Amino acid sequence: MKRKLLTTSIALSLAMLATPSYSVDFSGYFRSGVGVSNHGKQQTADKSYVGRLGNEDDTYGEIQLGQQLYNENGKTFYFDSMISMFSNSSNDNETTKNDDAEFGLRQLNLQAKGFVPGLPDATVWAGKRYYQRHDLHIIDTKYWNISGAGAGIENVKAGEGAFSFAWIRADAENMDVDCGNSLNSQECSSREDTYNDLNINYLDARYAGWKPWDGAWTEFGISYAMPNEADTQKNIFLAEGQKFDPKNSMMITGELSHYFSGLKSNQKLVLQYADKGLAHNMVDQGGGWYDVWSINDSAKGYRVIQAGDLPITDHISLSHVLTYGKADEISRWRDSTELLSAVGRGQYAWTKNQKTYLEAGTYQKKDSWKAGTETKYSGQKYTLAHAFSADIPMLTRPELRFFVSYLDGGNENRNRFNDDRSNTVNFGIQAEAWW
């Protein structure tokens, strides 16, 4: 299957290159490198809580090819595609044969602009895509990410901003089931691998672009998840040892961004609320996936994110992400969960192409159980890195970095790392690029 996927992707690429009318848009991303720790191989932990710099040990890439297929009288068709590649970088012979390397079909869609009467700027799309993801780069987290196969319309102008509406499929797989409760228990038992997959559809509505004052802009939206069992799947799902009936769930997001021209600083404030199967995202740094492995009928949660960058001088700049989240009853035995995370990255640019980073991150997480007990987790990371870069701004790529990192799992995680240690030191080299 994976070989067929790669062959299909190559064929699509060659077909687009053979089309003489329009140029091919080529973009992508990759990261890779090598590292080692003071106790065995490089070890990573909690990068969405403590930061990603010097805390990644994989090889990951995305190759995106797109092409305009039609342009006439204000109407256009645009084809977009993307494949991803992942491996743990452990050796040279990483192939799909033994799942050492993984290939994924991430995007394959068609976008039609100018076809809706009265809405010349609106784009209607169908296929598979990354749908308007909202990213926090230094912790590698997408806090608003409803992606998959679907269809929608975007850039429907209204006032200062525009609406977007989408229907996206994001099924849950490999759920626990009790086939004895199925209307067709015999078939369920013999074909459990099909009965334990649950169809989940998302309806997503957003409005972006309202500017409440000079230098500010906003975005608001709701993502509504709808589990969709077949009749033969009703009453068969289990979670945490008991019957589980997945409920419709929502996640509401509002964000305010502001550019402080005097400081040349971008700052963002994000407020989110979610319930039932989506509530756990508020304390797991998730972006909207539905939890079908926990009893969460009464779950509710919220999250506050503050992120931004601040140039101090021509040579010094800072970037940070602060997250606080709280969720109640996201599993059968949990009363509440709280998360507090803080990550900051500082940069000193020696020249246009030479810069040094210092990144520090810390988090605390607490589970309060219905039995009256508590479980606490914490961690810290400190990274010093020197980089060869294409320019001074912090997010300029390509970049090649030499790093040393100290990770501490906290008193609660004394056996977290190799040799039953609570901390580790990593050093290595990593390359990263996007284009």
Curated annotation (Swiss-Prot):
InterPro entries: G_neg_Bact_CarbUptk_Porin, Maltoporin, Porin_LamB, Porin_LamB_sf. GO terms for molecular function: maltodextrin transmembrane transporter activity; maltose transporting porin activity. CDD domains: Maltoporin-like. GO terms for biological process: monoatomic ion transport. Gene3D superfamilies: Porin, LamB type. It catalyses: beta-maltose(in) = beta-maltose(out). It is a multi-pass membrane protein. Induction: By maltose. It is found in: Cell outer membrane. Keywords: Cell outer membrane, Ion transport, Membrane, Porin, Signal, Sugar transport, Transmembrane, Transmembrane beta strand, Transport. One of its GO terms (cellular component) is pore complex. Residues 1-23 form the signal peptide. The record marks Y29, Y60, W434 as: Greasy slide, important in sugar transport. Pfam families: LamB (PF02264). NCBIfam families: PRK09360.1. Involved in the transport of maltose and maltodextrins. PANTHER family: CRYPTIC OUTER MEMBRANE PORIN BGLH-RELATED (PTHR38762:SF1). Homotrimer formed of three 18-stranded antiparallel beta-barrels, containing three independent channels. Belongs to the porin LamB (TC 1.B.3) family. This is Maltoporin. It comes from Pectobacterium atrosepticum (strain SCRI 1043 / ATCC BAA-672).
